[in-house]
Regions:
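Catalytic, metal-anchored helix/loop core of enzyme active sites in primary metabolism
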Residues: 224
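Adenosine-phosphate binding glycine-rich loop
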Residues: 220
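Class I SAM-dependent transferase core
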Residues: 1-82, 90-93, 98, 111-125, ...
Length: 224
């Protein structure tokens, strides 16, 4: 397989056609090579329009979704990012090239170890990974966080039936959350922006169907 041709085709045929037109994002996909974050058994699928299996029953998102997320959160060099669901470390690596610092949470020890190896192999130092459950929010703090342990951008890599308030409280004024909200088969990729101390705006980006985060909060369906 001609890897560079496959990468070019992925960008031109999958990613551009999914409204990812930001040239900085497209250039970054050539710098951070996706195949380096794909398990060895699935490297031949690195550029396919599909989710790639990871250890522990998890998956990498489709390439077009990773790129669209990166474009829509529009991370700036001075910003701190919280990622829920480190996986293989690929999204963290992309975010690190844009951000001041990335804090990434992974519930599976095997995946955290995999991501740490991959990120270290790229010489990425502006990332801290933690072993923990971030599905209902992240109470941990790090020296990279802003005032009150808040973040400029939060990226949640699995789906949630509802967005816990804990994430909204972690968001700085002007900050953005990317989350996939809903239940299969009707899920929506959303950007939630903090407009003031009490006001948030939500933009629906696309419809999708992604595996939910383990231990995600489920709303009660009881009625009175």
């Amino acid at each position: 397989m001609n890897i560079e041709l496959a990468r070019f085709n992925m960008i031109e045929q999958q990613i551009r056609t999914w409204d990812v037109l930001n040239q900085d994002v497209l250039n970054l996909l050539e710098v951070v090579k996706r195949e380096d974050f794909v398990p060895t058994a699935y490297k031949s699928l690195a550029f396919f329009d599909t989710e790639i299996p990871l250890p522990c029953g998890e998956n990498m998102l489709m390439p077009k979704m990773e790129a669209r997320i990166l474009q829509e959160v529009a991370v700036q060099k001075h910003e701190n990012v919280l990622e829920i669901g480190t996986g293989s470390g690929y999204m963290a690596a992309l975010l690190c090239h844009k951000a001041r610092h990335v804090t990434s949470i992974e519930i599976e020890p095997e995946l955290k170890a995999m991501a740490d190896r991959n990120l270290s192999g790229y010489g990425i130092t502006n990332v801290t990974t933690y072993l923990g459950d971030g599905a209902r929010g992240w109470a941990g703090t790090s020296s990279a966080e802003g005032d009150n342990g808040s973040y400029d951008v939060i990226v949640i890599s699995g789906s949630l039936p509802v967005l816990p308030d804990a994430f909204l409280k972690k968001l700085k004024l002007g900050g953005r959350i990317f989350a996939i909200i809903g239940d299969a088969p009707a899920m929506s990729g959303q950007i939630i922006s903090r407009m003031s101390d009490t006001a948030y705006s939500t933009v629906n980006l696309f419809e999708t169907n992604v595996k939910p985060l383990r231990n995600a909060i489920r709303p009660s369906h009881f009625s009175f």
